[in-house]
Amino acid sequence: MADSLKMGNLSLNESQHAPAAPPSNGRAAYIPPHLRQRTMGANVDGAAAPPPPGPAAGAGAWNGPRNAPRGGNWANANASDFSPRAPNVPNGNNSWTPTEAQRRPFDPHAYGHPGHGGSYGGSQGGSAKGSGDGQWRDGKHIPGPANARLERELFGVPNDPTKQSTGINFANYDDIPVEASGHDVPEPVNAFTNPPLDDHLISNIKLARYQTPTPVQKYSIPIVMNGRDLMACAQTGSGKTGGFLFPILSQAFQTGPSAVPAQASGQFGYGRQRKAYPTSLILAPTRELVSQIFDEARKFAYRSWVRPCVVYGGADIGSQLRQIERGCDLLVATPGRLVDLIERGRISLVNIKYLVLDEADRMLDMGFEPQIRRIVEGEDMPNVNERQTLMFSATFPRDIQMLARDFLKDYVFLSVGRVGSTSENITQKVEYVEDHDKRSVLLDILHTHGTSGLTLIFVETKRMADALSDFLLNQRFPATAIHGDRTQRERERALEMFRSGRCPILVATAVAARGLDIPNVTHVINYDLPTDIDDYVHRIGRTGRAGNTGIATAFFNRGNRGVVRELIDLLKEAHQEVPSFLESIAREGSGYGGRGGRGGRGRGGNATRDMRRMGGNVGGGAPSFGGSYGAPSGSSYGGGAGGYGAPPAYGGGYGGGYGGGSYGNPSGPTGPSSWW
């Protein structure tokens, strides 16, 4: 065998326990790694073993003894004036030089304030380096620099077809009657000015090309800015989202962030905290609606210290948690996912100044009342006297107003127009069509109107949505579908294709019926009429928005006679033509009792009036409501002896079309079938 193998001047047949021996033709002795770097005895030639050679200058490797200081070149390790590196040797990849001990001073603003978020600086308003966001510094709001790319993404360009613009009848909104009840109601504003709004918010409103506040905004802005609670009812498409975002963001820009509670100070580490402390919370029933509100919040918080976040079920919770960790000042959430994050200890409500319930009646209809009560009353949210609470919706039936007593204090009731009514900008047509003829009539309508605008078709079941969209595709009509069984990614993709016009026909179930603001919808077709007239109102409200005109067509047959009387009233109120077959079916007597809408609540003559102004006690409620809850003369609530008696039938209000599982399990917000 060849002479003993040497590595790094270490002979593999050396031993720590015996004198070195001449090379042997036998097997080399194994030396454990932890013994190889010790000072060696004589080598095979009888000379002292030199120290192991160091790496080449700048190589960055470390081959020195284990107990020696780390460095690069160890060739002169025995010299009295040894230094790990010669002064003129350039640094290597990982090599250390004495000059590196002089570190740069820590900049607390480079990555946001420690423990207070990231790119937006979280609740303390620091700004991530190069993020272009604003800051709150020394008691002042410092807007960030403009970002042309982000402006195009948020606000679009003039005449952008994907952004809603005001239509030819927008000026007619000034003729809509407004009723504000409560004591000391502030005077409305007629323009976006300072005061009361912050200058930075006004600049963002101008970027969005909003020129005049809508009626609900004219009243809600001064009401909220004066610290009052609000219950606002307005027609769909009338600017309710801006009605609560404008005053909340304006106050935030003027007053700055809230301090994180002292007991949370031990949670910080490496400039980031795991628990978020938002100051504003907006709850909405569906994923699509919270995403839409979040997009609006991003617009009007542009270049500010406020960081909006959105959380909802059906999406990756990991990415949502990372978003929250980067800073969360304004949180838009569905109730189920918010309860989940509270249980995980990732969100605290202790700093909440503003609580907004959007589409509040729909959230209660969908079984969210336990989650909402837990969020509002069972967690660490400030009580009703220490926060402002705002309720916005297009309808507020009586029992919802009664529930508001627990959440609101000394509130102003704002009613814009006849709440729950339809816009006169929408031309409503009702066609008598039997079920087996619906497809052929639909094709006739689509051929007649073409695909110049966006057409939204509402059906009652998820199976029908898929079947009808497949049928339209087979007939060479570009169609897609959206319903509760589709994944979040599929739904977002379908909505994006519909908004952009690449797929101008969308078949939808009730998941898209309320709250969604889809620009340039010119035609809404109720392929299946809902069993609740309020759902009909919200479905056709997807067109005729912001003063634009639109067409709504409904397929009616005797299977829909339960809503015939309310449908006739709705058509008359909006000055629409009432077909003779509706009148004849109504005279048959089947339409005068009905279910009264929404499982017994019904619309009734006063469903949109402030209950505090009506004499009568509401089932032992607060004294300010006084009297009895019986129906006023001439109106029927649920058709039951003129009274309210029947409990809300949340499960049966949709004719069983959703099979009990369309909305998932309201009591299990994190279940796999949950779509909120």
Swiss-Prot record:
InterPro entries: DEAD/DEAH_box_helicase_dom, Ded1/Dbp1_DEADc, Helicase_ATP-bd, Helicase_C-like, P-loop_NTPase, RNA-helicase_DEAD-box_CS, RNA_helicase_DEAD_Q_motif. It comes from the Eukaryota. Residues 56-69, 664-676 have a biased composition (Low complexity). Transmembrane segments: none annotated. GO terms for biological process: cytoplasmic translational initiation; negative regulation of cytoplasmic translational initiation in response to stress; positive regulation of formation of translation preinitiation complex; regulatory ncRNA-mediated gene silencing; spliceosomal complex disassembly. It catalyses: ATP + H2O = ADP + phosphate + H(+). ATP binds at A234, Q235, T236, G237, S238, G239, K240, T241. Its EC number is 3.6.4.13. It is an enzyme of class 3 (hydrolase). The keyword Cell membrane does not apply. A motif (Q motif) lies at residues 190-218. Keywords: ATP-binding, Cytoplasm, Helicase, Hydrolase, Initiation factor, Nucleotide-binding, Protein biosynthesis, RNA-binding. SMART domains: DEXDc, HELICc. A motif (DEAD box) lies at residues 358-361. Residues 425-586 form the Helicase C-terminal domain. The Q motif is unique to and characteristic of the DEAD box family of RNA helicases and controls ATP binding and hydrolysis. Belongs to the DEAD box helicase family. DDX3/DED1 subfamily. This is ATP-dependent RNA helicase ded1. The gene is ded1.
